[in-house]
Curated annotation (Swiss-Prot):
Binding residue positions for Mg(2+) 1: E92, D113, L115
CDD domains named in the record: FBPase
EC number: 3.1.3.11
The name this protein goes by in its record: Fructose-1,6-bisphosphatase class 1
Enzyme class: hydrolase
Pfam entry (one): FBPase_C
Catalytic activity: beta-D-fructose 1,6-bisphosphate + H2O = beta-D-fructose 6-phosphate + phosphate
Annotated localization: Cytoplasm
GO molecular function: fructose 1,6-bisphosphate 1-phosphatase activity; magnesium ion binding
Subunit structure: Homotetramer.
Gene Ontology terms: cellular component: cytosol
Cofactors named for this entry: Mg(2+)
Residues the record lists as binding substrate: D116, G117, S118, S119, N209, Y242, K272
Length: 333
């Protein structure tokens, strides 16, 4: 019988690979796992309680906020911020940075999207939480500010996501491989189910919202025409798989191989996805699993951010597939 390894135990085991570790990051990841359990509890009950529908407000992105978005955001801030282990936090739902109480001993910054894909929750499609952790630059946690959040993705010390679907899965990396855990509701624990995830170098799926085809530039249209052509030597045509929930589309492609593309459009020439809350954490995970992530021209993790809610195009997934998409975007093909 295989051993049952909880996420907390696995994090502690991973800590042994770093003799200089203080255990603080281990506690932070455990806090994130706990917050995910709280969000999961409400997501699975969403149709039974008054938590569906819109809250009657818009977020900093100009999007209508759903009640469950606000619930998830508040739960994560309260569950994680109360321990004082984070000096500063940033949420996709909050315009400004968040300073947790009792943060004088915090050494890290947390950036998160509390409920990615929440527009799908009413129709029982998978949604998720995405998070990113950085070491703050400021020597005094009480003086931590937005500059501690605006770091390149390559500076991340941990990143992960939780997908709430037919099962609840948490995936994380601390720069030493990618590991996945499935939630067992009978014991209330995340158990190791996907150790050392490695994404295929070449896949057969592509994920893109083709409903925006008229807004795509010519290079994106040429790319789509290319991957639909018959060519057994290159494994074409690809099959499309698009849920409309980034974390769900990314998770599937991470395991099975493929590419997720959210290119520039006429409505969003700088891209639509958020660099700090979606691009960076997923790029870190993808690279740790052997994949590739760019904005079509630059490595996502090398982008120097200038805004907390900065947007970016995103090409992410299997290395070979992302390179092909890049070549079209750059006009090489």
């Amino acid at each position: 019988m295989s051993k049952l390894i909880t996420i907390e135990r696995h994090i502690l085991e991973q800590q042994k690979n770093f003799p200089e570790a203080t255990g603080e990051l281990t506690d932070l990841l455990s806090d994130v796992a706990f917050a995910a359990k709280l969000v999961r509890r409400e997501v699975v009950r969403a149709g039974l309680v008054d938590i569906l529908g819109f809250a009657g407000s818009t977020n900093v992105q100009g999007e209508e906020v759903k009640k469950l978005d606000l619930f998830a955001n508040d739960k994560i801030i309260n569950a994680i911020g109360q321990h004082g282990r984070f000096a500063i936090m940033g949420s996709e739902e909050n315009e400004e940075i968040i300073t947790p109480p009792n943060n004088e001993n915090g050494s890290y910054a947390l950036l998160f999207d509390p409920l990615d894909g929440s527009s799908n929750i009413d129709v029982n499609v998978s949604v998720g939480t995405i998070f990113s952790i950085y070491k703050i630059k400021n020597s005094d946690p009480r003086k931590a500010d937005i500059s501690d959040c605006l770091q390149k993705g390559s500076e991340q010390v941990a990143a992960g996501y939780v997908i709430y679907g037919s099962s609840v899965v948490m995936v994380y990396t601390t720069g030493n491989g990618v590991h996945g855990f499935t939630y067992d509701p009978t014991i209330g624990e995340f158990l190791l189910s996907h150790e050392n995830i490695v994404t295929p170098k070449h896949g057969k799926y592509y994920s893109i919202n083709e409903g925006s085809y008229a807004q795509f530039n010519d290079t994106t249209k040429k790319y789509l025409d290319y991957i639909k052509e018959e060519d057994s030597a290159t494994g074409r045509p690809y099959s499309t798989r698009y849920i409309g929930s980034l974390v769900a589309d990314f998770h599937r492609n991470l395991l099975t191989g493929g590419v997720f593309v959210y290119p520039p459009t006429t409505n969003h020439p700088n891209g639509k996805l958020r660099l700090m809350y979606e691009g960076n954490p997923l790029a870190y995970i993808c690279e740790q699993a052997g994949g590739r992530a760019t904005d079509g021209r630059r490595r996502i993790l090398d982008i120097d951010p200038s805004e907390l809610h900065q947007r970016t195009p995103l090409y992410i997934g299997s290395e070979d597939d992302v390179r092909v998409a890049e070549e079209f975007e750059q006009g090489i093909r």
